[in-house]
Amino acid sequence: MDSNSIKVKQVDEVKISKYILKYTFQDWEDIVESDVVIVGAGPSGMTAAYYLAKAGLKTVVFERRLSFGGGIGGGAMLFHKIVIESPADEILKEMKIKLNKVEEGVYIVDSAEFMAKLAASAIDAGAKIIHGVTVDDVIFRENPLKVVGVAVEWTATQMAGLHVDPLFISAKAVVDATGHDAEVISVAARKIPELNIVIPGEKSAYSETAEELTVENTGMVAPGLYAAGMAVTEVKGLPRMGPIFGAMVLSGKRVAEIIIKDLRYS
């Protein structure tokens, strides 16, 4: 193609707006009834989205920021590398993420590639990632008591301090992948005491223990409500681990496997 002779298709402002609105609302009409809502597009959330969508479940990820990756982008104190240990390397290999082996079972990964390919893998599997949306509450039902969806609001609306009611998204499973604060589970614990959720809070760093315990404790917190990634450490009172991300992707895969099994037999 000769760049000097390119003829650019002319599209006026009205068409731009109409096309964006039409296809955005098509997506929203579809996701308003989802199989799984994941809150947070960090490593555990995007890994979970990949495996859930790959299994054929309608999966949407709501991310409050205008980017994905969670803590990946910050690397280690803004250095652009992170550590992955086995067996999490198998997940990264599946997503075609390059690994630099530094010792047996330990790898260095470029943080930008890690988050970009995690997101691309989830999207290619069929998950929908929507930025700029905050989940500020859950939907629940009684008899039996369970979480059945979330309330969503534009992050910008909340930042502006405007009083605007949310919209609601139904789901058979809700995953809190919001990180250290476990924001969704914290709201559910406070507003629905009948769920009997106690949140002891995250402990200080102990990487070796934290990685294994985070994966082991990943799963259902209350009927319909699940914890993945750093939300697990907050809810279960586990240590943090710093810029080693094996547990994050393993936790994402584990919560997906648990949800797939739960929905299959529900």
UniProtKB/Swiss-Prot annotation:
Binding, Fe cation: D165, H180
Lineage top rank: taxon: Archaea
Cofactor(s) it depends on: Fe(2+)
Annotated catalysed reactions: hydrogen sulfide + glycine + NAD(+) = ADP-5-ethyl-4-methylthiazole-2-carboxylate + nicotinamide + 3 H2O + H(+)
GO molecular function: iron ion binding; pentosyltransferase activity
Gene Ontology biological-process annotations: thiamine biosynthetic process; thiamine diphosphate biosynthetic process; thiazole biosynthetic process
Alphabetized UniProt keyword annotations: Iron, Metal-binding, NAD, Thiamine biosynthesis, Transferase
Binding-site residues for glycine, renumbered to this chain: R240
Keyword NAD: yes
Pfam families membership: Thi4 (PF01946)
InterPro entries, alphabetized: FAD/NAD-bd_sf, Thi4_fam, Thi4_prok
Coiled coil region boundaries: none
Subunit structure: Homooctamer; tetramer of dimers.
Family per similarity comment: Belongs to the THI4 family.
Designated name of the protein: Thiamine thiazole synthase
Species in which this protein is naturally found: Sulfurisphaera tokodaii (strain DSM 16993 / JCM 10545 / NBRC 100140 / 7) (Sulfolobus tokodaii)
